[in-house]
């Protein structure tokens, strides 16, 4: 695990950390995301509520963003080599966890591979602040084997709809990418 500098974006409510025992507290101070060998949601006493990510060994950077109302949190994992993943949690009466579906970005990747005449070789994303208490802005970069690069952005929105649990305990269909655009 590479140790990255801690970068605070106070206005956006975003903190980038290495996975070395860093707690990123919610604005109300009642919860935190703890990044260690795993990424967990904890309460103010340090008791684990949810495991968001079971293994951070391939992560170069973990970025955490709490919504201003402390009811939503988004975590971006950027790998040391190729890609990134986004997991999140939200609270109604209890905490739930969800994951951004890879199929959502699949059409974008296929279109850009055709445009740049090469396969995707690297992809990284970062958070760009909260648009609303349940929508966060995301920016991404794709690099293709042809040498081309594509910079893009989109909105990641929480949806409160009945879903099903996948094998990892994530509620599917709760985190939706929309408004994809070039930067």
Model features per residue range: what roles?
Residues 1-10:
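Bacterial N-terminal signal peptides that target proteins for export
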Residues 38-40, 81-89, 145-157:
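Structural motif
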Residues 53-58:
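Surface loop/turn motifs at the tips and blade-to-blade linkers of beta-strand repeat domains
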Residues 10-19:
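Hydrophobic h-region of N-terminal signal peptides that target proteins for export
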Residues 5, 18-25, 94-98, 105-183:
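Acidic, small-residue rich beta-repeat scaffolds with periodic aromatic anchors
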């Amino acid at each position: 695990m590479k140790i990255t500098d801690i970068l605070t974006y106070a206005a956006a409510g975003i903190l980038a950390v290495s996975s070395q025992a860093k707690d990123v507290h919610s604005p109300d101070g009642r919860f935190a995301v703890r990044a260690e060998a795993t990424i967990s949601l904890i309460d103010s006493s340090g008791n684990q509520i949810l495991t968001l990510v079971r293994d951070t060994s391939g992560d170069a950077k973990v970025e955490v963003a709490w919504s201003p109302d402390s009811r939503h949190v988004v975590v971006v994992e950027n790998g040391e080599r190729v890609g990134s993943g986004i997991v999140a949690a939200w609270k109604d009466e209890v905490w739930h966890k969800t994951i951004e579906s890879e199929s959502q970005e699949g059409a974008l990747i296929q279109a850009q591979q055709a445009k740049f005449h090469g396969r995707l070789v690297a992809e990284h994303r970062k958070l760009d602040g909260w648009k609303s208490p349940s929508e966060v802005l995301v920016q991404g970069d794709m690099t293709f084997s042809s040498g081309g690069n594509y910079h893009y952005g989109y909105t990641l929105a929480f949806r409160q709809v009945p879903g099903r649990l996948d094998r990892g305990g994530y509620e599917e269909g709760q985190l939706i990418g929309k408004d994809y655009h070039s930067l």
